[in-house]
Design a protein with these regions (language model features):
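C-terminal substrate-recognition/cap domain of FAD-linked oxidoreductases
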Residues: 1-100, 104-107, 111, 115
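Activity-critical C-terminal alpha-helical subdomain
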Residues: 130-165
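A structural signal for short, well-ordered beta-strand segments
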Residues: 43, 85-87, 123, 148, ...
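Short basic/hydrophobic patches in alpha-helices and adjacent helix-turn junctions
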Residues: 107-118, 134-135, 150
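Short proline/glycine- and acidic-rich turn/helix-capping motifs at secondary-structure junctions
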Residues: 12-25, 120-135
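Alpha-helix capping/hinge segments and adjacent helical runs
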Residues: 113-125, 154-158
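Short amphipathic alpha-helical segments
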Residues: 99, 103-107, 120, 128, ...
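C-terminal polymerase-core module
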Residues: 34-39, 45, 128-141
Length: 165
């Protein structure tokens, strides 16, 4: 058991290649297993490790004000600051859980901006997160990203107009 600032209650490190493979199989099935606990809203975020604890504390408090009793099923590869922040509908929830998604997303996105995180960790922005991308990045950041994309894709053939118009 490893605890750092009360952030981790339990941590296991693979001791062999086989154990690492077993962990990976477990991880691959985790989100599907979580869905058995109720309706799931999933967020693929990244946040600096130094801000992780305060992000979790604030987001849990604020989101619980919207959906009391919501379940937080969080896992990820913290070494690169990537978190699968999965929120599960509370037991006996009255109403449509998915109607709360936009309010929850606003809280998460504003905290990610405040703590220098990102709305997308390993899965990219894509069409689904395009609006959130523009809401959470400054004009300066977007200009720099466009310049980098243009450097590697001067003919704009890769994902044309998927993120940058």
């Amino acid at each position: 058991m490893i605890s750092h600032n009360n952030l981790f209650e339990d941590l296991i490190i693979a001791q062999s290649i086989q154990e690492g493979n077993n962990f990976w199989q477990f991880r691959e099935k985790l989100t599907e297993a979580q869905k058995l606990d109720g309706k799931l809203l999933g967020f693929d975020i990244s946040i600096p490790l130094s801000s992780l604890e305060i992000f979790f504390q604030k987001s849990k408090f604020l989101i619980n004000n919207i959906v009391p009793g919501i379940k937080f099923h969080t896992f990820g590869h913290l070494g690169d600051s990537n978190i699968h922040y999965n929120l599960i509908e509370p037991d006996n929830f009255k109403g449509n859980f998915f109607d709360c998604e936009n309010d929850i997303k606003k809280i998460i996105n504003s905290l990610l901006v405040e703590y220098h995180g990102s709305i997308s960790a390993e899965h990219g922005i894509g069409i689904l997160k395009k609006d959130d991308f523009y809401k959470t990045k400054s004009k300066e950041e977007i200009i720099i990203m466009k310049k980098i994309k243009n450097l590697f894709d001067p003919n704009n053939i890769l994902n044309n107009k998927k993120i940058f118009d």
